[in-house]
C-alpha cells in the first residue's frame, strides 16, 4: 500500500511542488486548499502531468477552527492511513483581521489551525506508523523570519502591537516550537517532527509580504519537505530545524523548553483541546 501524505496549501507554490514530487515518487497525496475549485483544478492538472498518480483532495479554511475540525473528520473518514502531514500553508496579512474564533488571522492560519489539525490527525498518524513499522512524519514549513519573532503569550493576537511582519514572525517562531514540542511528546519510533525554512522562494506569500523580491523556484523550496517526507530512515533526529536543507540551530526562543510548554498550553486552550 502506498504511503499517504497530506500537504496543506498545495494548490500552488511550494505546496504544489511538494505534492507533485511526492505523487511522482509513488505516495498517495491529499491536496489541500481553502477553495474546492482550486483543489479540484490542482488535482486535474497533476493527474494530467502524472498519469496513474494517487490523488485525493480536501478543502477547508485553516483560519476557522470549525472548518479545521470538519476537514480533519473528512480526512479520517476517507483515508484509512496517514503517514505524513506537511503543514505548508501560510499567509502574510496586509492588515490586522480577527477570525470568527477571535484569533488574529496570521496566528490562526499559520499556527493555531495547523496545531489543531495535527492533534486531530495524530491518532491516525500513530496508528499508521505502528502498521507500517516506519515513523510517521509531521513537517512544519516555517521561515527564517522566526529568528525575528517573539511569542506574545499575553497578547497572541497582537491587539496592542500588530504589524504584518510581527504577526508573521511570531507565527513562524510558533511553527518551530510546535515541531520541537511534538518531538518531545512522541517517541521517534512512532513520530518524527521537523521544521524548515525553505529559502527565499518566489511565491505569492513572498510578494504579498515583501514586495517585488526575486526568489528561487518553488521546486527548490520544496526539496527539504520532499526529502523528509519520503525518506524511510531518518537522516536527522526528530525536532531538527533545517534552513535551506541544512540542519541548523533555530533561534534561542525556540530552544526555550518553558516557552515551548507555555505556547503549547495556550494553543491547546485556544483550540479547545
Regions found by a protein language model. Name each.
Residues 50-54, 74-87, 93-98:
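A glycine-rich helix->loop->beta "capping" turn
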Residues 195, 212-261, 265, 269:
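C-terminal helical subdomain
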Residues 90-107, 126-190, 197-212:
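Catalytic loop of short-chain dehydrogenase/reductase
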Residues 1-36:
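Canonical Rossmann dinucleotide-binding motif of NAD(H)/NADP(H)-dependent dehydrogenases/reductases
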Residues 118-119, 180:
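A short, exposed helix-loop element centered on a Lys and neighboring polar residues
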Residues 36, 58-73:
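The beta1-alpha1 cofactor-binding region of Rossmann-like NAD(H)/NADP(H)-dependent oxidoreductases
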Residues 4-7, 85-86, 138:
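Conserved hydrophobic beta-strands of the Rossmann-like cofactor-binding core
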